[in-house]
């Protein structure tokens, strides 16, 4: 059987090299979309990891919530969120928290499942300090005003065409190759008049 060992090794190597990539990929959402499409949006500190039943294939982070922006009704009688669950493997969209600073606050947007906050690679999770003043204002109050009747519509190729008067064309990805462009950091898609939504500045208006 020995002469066949090198051949078997070559076949296995070839299968490994040519196997399709299973990495999780997704485009980060506009922060307004993240708030509108999430059940829970909070500010929190990641303070540690907790033991989870390994058969669940989940990773659990212990957090300390410092502020809730959305989710009071979804939590029901619960007054706090202490844990965040995510798939254990990055290949299946598991979120890996890399910061070792336990005092650093993060904006975390996710959904509830079986009473636990769930996030993944595609979720909006960002250091609070990295958000612009306009984005902080948006999460605190303004983004919610556009959730019911307005939609941030991503432009992924030319020509970009709006499908509705309630859509705002988001071109940051296409023009800059980044989700952190001007529209993301400074604008919200809000009602201008009934049936019409436009990009509006999140800067405070002067009296």
Swiss-Prot record:
Signal peptide residues on this chain, from the entry's feature table: 1-23
SMART domains: NTR (SM00206)
Record keywords: Disulfide bond, Glycoprotein, Growth factor, Metal-binding, Metalloenzyme inhibitor, Metalloprotease inhibitor, Phosphoprotein, Protease inhibitor, Secreted, Signal, Zinc
GO CC, alphabetical: extracellular matrix; extracellular space
Residues linked to a glycan: 53, 77, 101
Keyword Lipid biosynthesis in record: no
Expressed in which tissues: Ubiquitously expressed. Highest expression in kidney and ovary.
Residues that, per the record, bind Zn(2+): 24
PROSITE patterns: NTR
Subcellular localization, as worded in the UniProt entry: Secreted
Gene3D superfamilies per UniProt: 2.40.50.120, Tissue inhibitor of metalloproteinase-1. Chain B, domain 1
Modification after translation: The activity of TIMP1 is dependent on the presence of disulfide bonds. N-glycosylated.
Involved in metalloproteinase-binding: annotated span: 24-27, 90-91
GO molecular function, one term: metalloendopeptidase inhibitor activity
Pfam families xref list: TIMP
Positions carrying Phosphoserine: 178
Disulfide feature: 24-93, 26-122, 36-147, 150-197, 155-160, 168-189
Annotated site (Involved in metalloproteinase-binding): 37
GO aspect biological process, one term: positive regulation of cell population proliferation
Domain NTR: 24-147
Function: Metalloproteinase inhibitor that functions by forming one to one complexes with target metalloproteinases, such as collagenases, and irreversibly inactivates them by binding to their catalytic zinc cofactor. Acts on MMP1, MMP2, MMP3, MMP7, MMP8, MMP9, MMP10, MMP11, MMP12, MMP13 and MMP16. Does not act on MMP14. Also functions as a growth factor that regulates cell differentiation, migration and cell death and activates cellular signaling cascades via CD63 and ITGB1. Plays a role in integrin signaling.
Complexes and interactors: Interacts with MMP1, MMP3, MMP10 and MMP13, but has only very low affinity for MMP14. Interacts with CD63; identified in a complex with CD63 and ITGB1.
Family stated for the protein in its record: Belongs to the protease inhibitor I35 (TIMP) family.
Designated name of the protein: Metalloproteinase inhibitor 1
Organism of origin: Canis lupus familiaris
